[in-house]
């Protein structure tokens, strides 16, 4: 009996080791020079389009960054969020966390069109999302990084998964945030650093109404200023947008964390990062050192880009980001 139990434990260990090796192998296939021979002009081509779009509308930088996040947290960084509905599946665009909220699809289409003309059938939509996220941060004054590439695109999307709570709602508690990020291999420090993306961008009234009218851990003058464009009545001004960082809304810096220390986080999921909990010290450190924030944000973005990529012969290189081949 004891011998059988030992054999069973060894078998379970071998299976676990195999799974870990498969995950490591997939990540190992991602590399920064993946397209250096097959599409050498990829990076400057993407940069030019993102630069043009950010020049037209600064807000689009935050939208492109968020698009990558919402893709990676639903079955991995596989560009499933870009797929339109088909007869065989309902896509993720109209799921609760994305509907009337996630933007930037047309920018990805424009980039894909240009890249296809240069290097047909070579570059995945998933990799384009990763590059545009990096370029958006850079163009708003943040620190860049070398993007690991080699992802392939999914051939399906999942409305139900996108709606299942894997994407943190704006009313999240700290425990909920920690658990959701941990499920994707991201630490509490990674979570706080990635939340710093809210140093740019805007949120709709419907996502922060409860906070500005009902919260007690909020600066009163801040709450009053936000109420001017966000009426208390549900259905009134739901889509009115407010900037997330009052101080430097168009600069990727550490101001977001200074706002949290002063109880001026716009979303509940922002302020819970500094509310007497386990992440308070991280917020304080970022509020005092933008370089510490930049360092950890870059590391967390690279880790997020490693979430369950399709590599090798898995998935496909879509000709259009909106539909499978």
UniProtKB/Swiss-Prot annotation:
PTM sites of type Pyrrolidone carboxylic acid: 29
Principal cellular location given in the protein's record: secreted
Cofactor(s) in the UniProt record: heme b; Ca(2+)
Keywords annotated in UniProt: Calcium, Disulfide bond, Glycoprotein, Heme, Hydrogen peroxide, Iron, Metal-binding, Oxidoreductase, Peroxidase, Pyrrolidone carboxylic acid, Secreted, Signal
Active-site residues (renumbered): 70
GO terms for cellular component: extracellular region
InterPro entries (UniProt xref): Haem_peroxidase, Haem_peroxidase_sf, Peroxidase_pln, Peroxidases_AS, Peroxidases_heam-ligand_BS, Secretory_peroxidase
Entry binding sites for heme b: 198
Record: glycosylation sites: 99, 214
One Pfam assignment: peroxidase
Enzyme class per UniProt: oxidoreductase
Binding site for Ca(2+) 1: 71, 74, 76, 78, 80
Signal peptide residue numbers: 1-28
GO molecular function: heme binding; lactoperoxidase activity; metal ion binding
Cysteines paired by S-S bonds: 39-119, 72-77, 125-321, 205-230
Recorded catalytic activity of this chain's protein: 2 a phenolic donor + H2O2 = 2 a phenolic radical donor + 2 H2O
Biological process terms in GO annotation: hydrogen peroxide catabolic process; response to oxidative stress
Record site feature (Transition state stabilizer), residues: 66
Membership in a protein family: Belongs to the peroxidase family. Classical plant (class III) peroxidase subfamily.
General remark: There are 73 peroxidase genes in A.thaliana.
Primary role: Removal of H(2)O(2), oxidation of toxic reductants, biosynthesis and degradation of lignin, suberization, auxin catabolism, response to environmental stresses such as wounding, pathogen attack and oxidative stress. These functions might be dependent on each isozyme/isoform in each plant tissue.
Name this protein carries in UniProt: Peroxidase 68
Protein source organism: Arabidopsis thaliana
Gene name tied to this protein: PER68
């Amino acid at each position: 009996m004891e011998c059988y139990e030992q054999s069973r434990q060894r078998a379970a260990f071998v299976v676990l080791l195999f799974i870990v090796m498969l995950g490591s192998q997939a990540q190992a296939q991602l590399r920064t020079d993946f397209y250096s021979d097959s599409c050498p002009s990829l990076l400057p081509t993407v940069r030019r389009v993102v630069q043009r779009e950010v020049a037209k509308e600064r807000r689009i930088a935050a939208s492109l960054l968020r698009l990558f996040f919402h893709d990676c947290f639903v079955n991995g960084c596989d560009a499933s969020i870009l797929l339109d509905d088909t007869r065989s599946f309902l896509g993720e665009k109209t799921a609760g966390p994305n509907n009337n909220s996630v933007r930037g699809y047309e920018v990805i289409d424009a980039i894909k069109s240009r890249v296809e003309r240069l290097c047909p059938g070579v570059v995945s939509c998933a990799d384009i999302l990763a590059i545009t996220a990096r370029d958006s941060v850079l163009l708003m004054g943040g620190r860049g990084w070398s993007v690991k590439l080699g992802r392939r695109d999914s051939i399906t999307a999942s409305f139900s998964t996108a709606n299942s709570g894997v994407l943190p709602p704006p009313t999240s508690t700290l425990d909920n945030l920690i658990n959701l990020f941990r499920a994707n291999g991201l630490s509490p420090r990674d979570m706080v650093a990635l939340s710093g993306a809210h140093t740019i961008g805007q949120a709709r009234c419907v996502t922060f109404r409860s906070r500005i009218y009902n919260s007690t851990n909020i600066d009163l003058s801040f709450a009053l200023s936000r109420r001017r464009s966000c009426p208390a009545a549900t259905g009134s001004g739901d889509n009115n947008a407010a900037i997330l960082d009052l101080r430097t809304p168009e600069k990727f810096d550490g101001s977001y964390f200074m706002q949290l220390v002063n109880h001026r986080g716009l979303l509940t999921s922002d302020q819970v990062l500094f509310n007497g909990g386990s992440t308070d010290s991280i917020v304080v450190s970022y509020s005092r050192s933008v370089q510490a924030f930049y360092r950890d944000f870059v590391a967390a973005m690279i880790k997020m880009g490693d979430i369950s990529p399709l590599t090798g012969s898995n998935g496909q290189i879509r000709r259009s980001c909106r539909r499978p081949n």
